[in-house]
Amino acid sequence: MTKPPLLVTCGLPYTNGPCHLGHLRTYVPADCYVRYMRRTGEEVVFVSGSDNHGTPIVVSAEEQGTTPRALSEQYHRHFDETFRRMGVSFDHFGMTDDPACHHRTQDIVQRLVDNGYVYKQVVNQAYCPKCKRFLPDRYVEGICPYCGKQARGDECDQGCGKHLEPGEIKDPVCKICGTKAEFRNQEHYFLKLSAFRDYLLPFLDNLKGTSNARNYAIGWIKDELHDWCITRTLEWGVKFPGRDDLVVYVWVDAPIGYIAFTEEWAKENGRDWKRYWCKDNRVTHFIGGDIIYHHCIFWPGLLKGAGYGEPYAVVASGMVKVDDHKFSKSRGYVVWTNDDYLDKGLPADCLRYYLLAYTSHTKELNFSWKVFGERINNEVVNILGNFLYRTLFFAHKEFGGVPGGSVDPAILAEIEKCQKSVDDQMQAYEFKGAVDTVMGLAAFGNTYIQTNAPWKLIKTDRAAAAQVIKNGIQIAKALCLLIEPVMPVKAQECWAQLGYIDRVAAHRVDEGVVIVPERQIPAPAPLFARLEEKQIAELDAVLQQRVRDADKKTEKTPMISIEDFSKVEIKTGKVLAAESIPKSSKLLKLQVDIGGETRQIVSGIAAFYKPDELVGKDVIVLTNLAPAKIFGVESNGMILAAGDAASLLTPLKPVEPGTKIR
């Protein structure tokens, strides 16, 4: 039976700022996967586009004195060009503000209405009396009702990460003018997401992709599934059918963009787009780990309600840190793709390698210039580049090219073993494992050449030296074929140095065992240049200056009097028990002895400590904080910690629980 085609999509970059390392964590692995799968004989279509709607773009456009459409077009062109420079080769890269996306969004929303999955409801929405406007999503900031942290109107981005519906945020403030907002009634439309609970659980059990996406979504659904408000009071966006005063929520039209972009590609290429979105499709979404909820719960529910096929797989990446700090544009912990990397003349292939080889796709990637330089020099230059150059140089110098004859069976067996392992890893979305396997073959080649020393052997046995080089050339060919999805530009350069005149990407990845014929080859040149310490230091200096500049811009905390400070009660405590909170990847529930009583405290440190690590640990507790419910769990106090990594404050010497901090 013929397999259905593979349609691969990437989460859409938002057109209100330039491309950075966090974006590439999604797009480079997706491109690597697409390149590999095509070269196994699969029919693959690769689409994405820019996300043009929603309040952040409207706010940014107003701040910059331009229109949302002009701002979107500016950054759409930027992303399109940047992805090309990074070797990310989409078949189609569209815009969600294009007519095709408007049409498909309104069609799907109308289907949901007709099928009874959408209803009207009056909600309390933040309203600015000064601006005389309702404040959807990021037009308003305030306090998260679940964890008490600073939050945006649609999401608690600084705390528990929970999606917020209109009217939920506490102490709302207008982001435009800073005026305290009030709540007023307004009619909106909701998707009956709760109606899909019985569908979503078995769907997730069968969903392919990475386990982090599947498990996170299952945790949400097993508790309570809330309906979603799918309209906003904005002029910019896709109009809700029959309502000129409302647009659909950006998380409705953004994923529908995947379908619209497929339609546009199909129209350009004489294909039927419905073939890629039928019931038995293989739609595979590559996304960042922060949008799992939208792609594994909201999106499949929406598709089901509208009568479309469900996603086949969701591949979610881990988050990105910079120099051990949480990725943050406002705090300066960001690496810009163009300004900091490509425009400095650094090879796109080396950054692709780092992103794929640093860690497993689902784990956190911590970028530092120092480690980047070390890995490129020690792995790419010293192992891969060294083997390819020394082998090709010797072949050209001593034999004028590739010697004739056969390849040792043991060498072919090693190549076949490598090809099989790479395929297993790629099919499982384990890109680091695949890269490590390829680099293992390069290391094997280096050891083989070093052990057999053809530069010595040729003095006494030219035929034996020729056999060693023949074997080395065969390994080099296999490496070219296997590394192409990771480093497409350098793989093509190597392919030409092997004497081929076509594209390496036109060949199957398993052709590494097809013998390289006897022929002349051009004089090779080193494929990779070492990154000098001075260059790395200069790149790092730019980052550190950016952090310092951001610190200067940070608003200083106002001074307080000793009387104000005396109102705060801080004591030592000892953790008696700790456990995870269902559905939250950030929060732990702790039982803490503070001297004479045990307090239950919810703390956002789950990303840094396992529950059993905390039991018995001495901590510092703010004890007279008003009780609050966080994620539905009562919290009576606050554990004090320092920095983005939540380093717990603890006494240097043993003290009794309940000792006051003075």
From Swiss-Prot:
Source species: Methanoregula boonei (strain DSM 21154 / JCM 14090 / 6A8)
GO cellular component: aminoacyl-tRNA synthetase multienzyme complex; cytosol
Residue numbers covered by motif 'KMSKS' region: 326-330
E.C. number(s) listed in UniProt: 6.1.1.10
UniProt GO BP: methionyl-tRNA aminoacylation
Compartment(s) of residence: Cytoplasm
Subunit structure, interactors included: Homodimer.
Cofactor: record remark: Binds 1 zinc ion per subunit.
Protein known as: Methionine--tRNA ligase
PANTHER family for this protein: METHIONINE--TRNA LIGASE (PTHR45765), METHIONINE--TRNA LIGASE, CYTOPLASMIC (PTHR45765:SF1)
NCBIfam families according to UniProt: metG, metG_C_term, PRK00133.1
Reactions performed catalytically: tRNA(Met) + L-methionine + ATP = L-methionyl-tRNA(Met) + AMP + diphosphate
GO molecular function terms noted in the UniProt entry: ATP binding; metal ion binding; methionine-tRNA ligase activity; tRNA binding
Pfam name, any one: Anticodon_3
